[in-house]
Each structure stands twice: as structure tokens, then as C-alpha cells.
Amino acid sequence: MPIPILHCDRNSKELYSRFLQGAREDLTTATDRILPILESVRTQGDQALFSYTEMFDGIKLSQLTIDPKKIKTNVDEKTKEAFLRAKSNIEAFHMEQKRESWSKVIDGNRLGVKYTPIPSLAVYAPGGKALYPSSVLMGIIPAKIAGVPSIQLITPPQKDGIPEILVWLAQIMDIDRIVTVGGAQGIAAAAYGTESVPKSEFIVGPGNAYVAAAKSYLSGQGLIGIESPAGPSEVCIIADENANPKWIACDMLSQAEHGEDSSAILLTTDLTLAKRVSEELEIAFSERPKRLQMKQTAIYENSSILVFPTLDDCIWFSNELAPEHLEIQTKDYESVFAKIEHAGSVFLGPYSPVAMGDYISGTNHILPTARGSRIYSSLGVDTFLKRVTFQEVTKESLENLYPFVKLMSELEGLDEEHGTSVKVRTRQFQ
């Protein structure tokens, strides 16, 4: 059952029905299941967290938080070297995003912006097979650069304790505490706060449908901020006849490895390349059978190769799709990139697979999905900063601008108090 190869143009109805409806996860069922959990944590606090941890994780905890500085770790040196290299690159990239407060005189008044960090952050790290220590770096580093003063790591407990790599990362990133609670109850603890778990104003990090549902619901209630709403992982690849079909197949499968709901879409004008990529996918399935059923489901059911008449058509569709990850594997990839408007993160040229950004290059891998990059950006320093605008109006400027305030406030029917609050400061009133 090879991957579907579809011949398309801008008027193809299937493009809209199949690809442009948005692939955001339907969290209705998950939300229904987690609402009682959220309410229990809100009303019962620590007691609910102990109970749910024993129920879902099979672990009876004696405490809910630990100080990472008090735990000895034995992470091997090669692993440390890899994560320290990633940490260095991520820090260097995100340092370029730092903001400076500013002010400027406009029409006689000093106006400006003061940047202040959010007061607190929780970073969620899933447990078990879905352990993503790289996401811990991606969430914490830009927050640290932004100046967030309080950061806690939330992760489900394991039968043999918290994974050493997470503890070590918490140590080198100077995290306040590790909260040993996972799932929706862990998200609720961060949003509401309990006797042992301080409330956080913002939370980031990957998780299953129940974690996503809890984040979405609690954010909608105004209880905690989140990064862009999450959906299944996705990659879009724009490629021409110069691209390597084996490399493209590998890049598509690297997304399929995330889960059967992941998607990988190749956009090309070259039918020969399309067929060769399809063949390379089948070869890869036979050569690398690990997680075979999951990868095949993602490729056969959620992925496609789309053949368009022109490269501009491929670019147009990519902008409509607004993918989480976009690879551009064309001869003149810079000219293609110049026309890209919507993508979470872009990978330019044949030697820039998504996995480089996932781990080591330095860009952030916490990205908007399901066409979210049309309105959201990747996680960054700005995510954790607030803009406080200010103005200092001079006496002379107030005198000069009062007639305009008077006219505008009268027009809106608010002159009695709005207009008066300016008028009483003018010479004619005094």
C-alpha cells in the first residue's frame, strides 16, 4: 500500500477537504474525562494529587516535590556533552531575541515600552516512552533569558524514580523544584496551585491528549497561559528534481516516528521524484521495522505526495498549509524561502533535516501545529515577556491636545468624565 501520490492544482477540491480543514486534535472526549480530575485538584489539592498518582501511575508518593540540587545523578559524560552542546546553541540563538525597553517623544509626549517577564513558569515533561528531555531545554532556556524568576518542572514519577537526565537538566538550569505528578492532574496543580505546588502563571511542554486537553481547558478559563494549542506533529517538504529521494523519505519517516497521527507531505513538480520517494519509503519500512505499524499508519493514512504544475503552486500550498516544520530542498532554496509567509520553523537546503532543529542547531522545537503558524510563532523569549506601555504627557502637550480629546470624547458620549479629566488640568479651567 504505497503512499498516495496526487496530481493537484490550486483548484483541487481535495486540497481543501483533506489538508486545509486543520488537523487540530479533537479533545472533546479527553476534556470530558479530565474535568472531574481538574475539579478534584482544585478542591482537594495535595490529597487529590497523591490519590491520582497512585491510581494512574501505581506509585504511592510520600511527597510531591523534590529539590533537584539534593539528588545525586550519574549521567554519562557523552550524554552530558551532547546536551551541553545543545544548551549552548539554544542559549546563543535565543539571546539574540532579548528585548530592551525604549521610549520616544511623539507629538510632545514621552511614550515607550517596558518589557517585564511573566512571574512564573511550569515546564511539563512527559514520562515513560515519551520522555523528551530536549523539550525541557527548549522550554526553560528562553524563559531564563526573558528573566522569569520562578520555574518548576512537572513530570510523572517512575517506579525507579525521576529519570536522571531530567534531574541533571533541572540542576544545570537551576530549576526551583521538580513536581512529581503527571497527566491532567499535574497541569491542574500548576494552574490552581496546591499546598505543596506553587501556582504557575504559564505552562509549556508536550504531552498526550489528556495533557493537551487540560492545558487548553485551563487556559480557556484564564487560569494559566500556554504556548500555541498543540496537535499532531507534521512536516511539509518542498522539493525539486535536484533533491535526494532517500533523504526526503527519511525526513518524512522522522515525523511518522512521533505517532500514527503525525503527517508528512511532499510538494513537488517532479513526478519522477515523487515515485522514487514512494519507493524509498517502502525500502525504509523493510530495513527499519522498529515502530513499523505506527510509521505505516502515519504515512499511508495521514501523509501524501502532491505533484503541482509549478514551484509557485507548491509555495502557495505550503503557505496555505502553514506547517509546523517546512523543509525546502530545491536548487535555489533561498528564493523559495523568500516567498514563505507561514511556517513554524524552516529548514533550508539538503543538509537541514528537521532532526537538527529538534535537538542541536539552537532554534526552538516547540512550534505551532495544525495551521497554527498562520497566527502563532515558535516558542521564544517573547513568549515569556509582557509589553508594558507607558506615557509621560507634558503640561504644554496636554494644553495643545485637549481640543482633540474634547471632540473625540463628545463623539463617543464620554465627555462628561473623560473630557473633564483632561480639561481640569488646562489653564482655561484653572
Swiss-Prot record:
Its cofactor is Zn(2+). This is Histidinol dehydrogenase. Coiled coil: none annotated. Pathway: Amino-acid biosynthesis; L-histidine biosynthesis; L-histidine from 5-phospho-alpha-D-ribose 1-diphosphate: step 9/9. Keywords: Amino-acid biosynthesis, Histidine biosynthesis, Metal-binding, NAD, Oxidoreductase, Zinc. The active site is at E324 (proton acceptor), H325 (proton acceptor). SUPFAM superfamilies: ALDH-like. GO terms for molecular function: histidinol dehydrogenase activity; NAD binding; zinc ion binding. Pfam families: Histidinol_dh. GO terms for biological process: L-histidine biosynthetic process. GO terms for cellular component: cytosol. It is an enzyme of class 1 (oxidoreductase). Belongs to the histidinol dehydrogenase family.
